[in-house]
């Protein structure tokens, strides 16, 4: 839990009932049946976590978005050490500091290798410390660590061990690892290094290459949870913007527009049909499909408004039957 300084994964119970009205007073805590375990740890998460990258945008009302997410029982926020992420971290920290039920929220931090953020052991510890200062909290509940590209996995895991020992991190998951690296990490864990509890990877109706391939097989064999990024294919599966030009205006427009074509259209048609039947948006149907996949603990979403939050959270209680799942499988192939 996010402690503020002074001064499948687990399967869920679903139903087709509409969301209840938001409470006017008192915190809303997701029922235990909705929260999913993270590997073999004591951590459990609401099936959707909020990507703080959305909060760094000027047009987004961060506190309002966070309040809406929390009102539906959401309890996980993802922060990262990417360029321009500091404003989002500061918004999250300020909101947590003033929240009446702040201790129920989990912070997931994504740190590691890119040309501007090399994941050397010392740099990893330093960047986590800097992030904690911006957030105004004492620890990250989950650390998603990326490889440094230099093959020094033992050193990287040693840095994770330091963070765990100092209480700056609760548990760790692998992010951006190849299947071979994940296997090596398990071997190193057998020699005393920290063991990963899960794997963070891109996973959606239109991108399941890693989850369906060797990485997914190794993760399943090790009992690791899947934490999914880009679950709506960078906005394409929201179904709001469908033309290449319109998609290009999204925050990840180039990546979203890459799905324009026959396959993308087939998937959107299937999402539209199922959504019309179940009174749900294409985004909710796409997320419900993902949350039904084996091993999935949570998906990171980046809504841009409270209405977007309402739409995506519908996925948590949406039940897709065998016919719906078969239609989506046909469309995405």
Model feature map: region roles:
Residues 51-63, 111-123, 146-148:
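Active-site mouth loops of central-metabolism enzymes
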Residues 39-44, 93-106, 132-137, 161-164, ...:
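Acidic (Asp/Glu)-rich catalytic clusters
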Residues 132-152:
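Active-site groove signature of glycoside hydrolases
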Residues 50, 140, 172:
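Glycine-centered flexible beta-alpha turn that most often forms the glycine-rich phosphate-binding loop
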Residues 103-115, 199-203:
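A short, structured active-site edge motif that brings together acidic residues
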Residues 2-106:
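N-terminal binding-site loop/beta-alpha segment at the start of enzyme catalytic domains
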